[in-house]
């Protein structure tokens, strides 16, 4: 199953890697910091077809519409382009993310940055890989090893609370970085 999901996500990656005139085909979704492009929609439509072809008994929940009430045991959860602002600005730090859940529990997950061809894949109980190589937690003390990463929120009314949390994280870890793609961060 994981290999089939990976193949679909890689094919979708070709669509965004080859994108042109991105800014022209962009609109605001909920505000200036929450964008959607024609590529978000096209990638989601492609993944909708491909993933339900792999697992037709699953529901499909995508960020760019096509929301459905999840009534089946299995469900695909899809973010067609995470880091859309980066994508629009042609900063190659965006990704496609797909999870296949069973009764609310993630069983398979894939996060793919097609610009640098980094593909993270995981199957519950089998570990995670980066480009096919197993990855592991380092085992170092968190305060000296973790560079916390985070993303902003679209609702500015949460800014003070969000920054307070970031400050606490900064004080309790090695460093804090924010690159604009929550899943890659």
Regions found by a protein language model. Name each.
Residues 1-81:
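N-terminal subdomain of lithium-sensitive/metallo-dependent phosphomonoesterases centered on the IMPase/IPPase/PAP
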Residues 24-27, 128, 173-177:
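Short secondary-structure junctions
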Residues 70-129:
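DPxDG-like acidic metal-binding loop motif
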Residues 107, 135-137:
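Short, isolated positions in well-ordered beta-strands
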Residues 137-185:
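An extended, acidic
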């Amino acid at each position: 199953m994981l290999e089939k999901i990976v193949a679909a996500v890689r094919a979708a990656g070709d669509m965004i890697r080859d994108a042109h005139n991105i800014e022209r085909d962009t609109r605001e979704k909920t505000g200036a910091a929450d964008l959607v492009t024609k590529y978000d929609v096209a990638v989601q439509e492609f993944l909708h077809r491909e993933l339900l072809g792999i697992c037709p008994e699953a529901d499909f929940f995508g960020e760019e519409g096509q929301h459905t009430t999840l009534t089946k045991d299995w469900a695909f959860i899809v973010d067609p382009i995470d880091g859309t602002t980066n994508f629009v600005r042609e900063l190659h730090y965006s990704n496609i993310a797909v999870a296949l859940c069973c009764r609310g529990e993630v069983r398979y997950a894939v996060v793919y940055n097609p610009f640098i061809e980094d593909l993270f894949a995981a199957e519950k109980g089998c570990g995670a890989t980066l480009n096919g190589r197993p990855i592991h937690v380092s085992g170092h003390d968190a305060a000296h090893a973790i560079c916390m990463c985070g993303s902003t929120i679209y609702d500015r009314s949460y800014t003070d609370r969000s920054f307070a949390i970031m400050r606490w994280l900064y004080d309790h870890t090695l460093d804090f970085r924010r690159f604009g793609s929550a899943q890659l961060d």
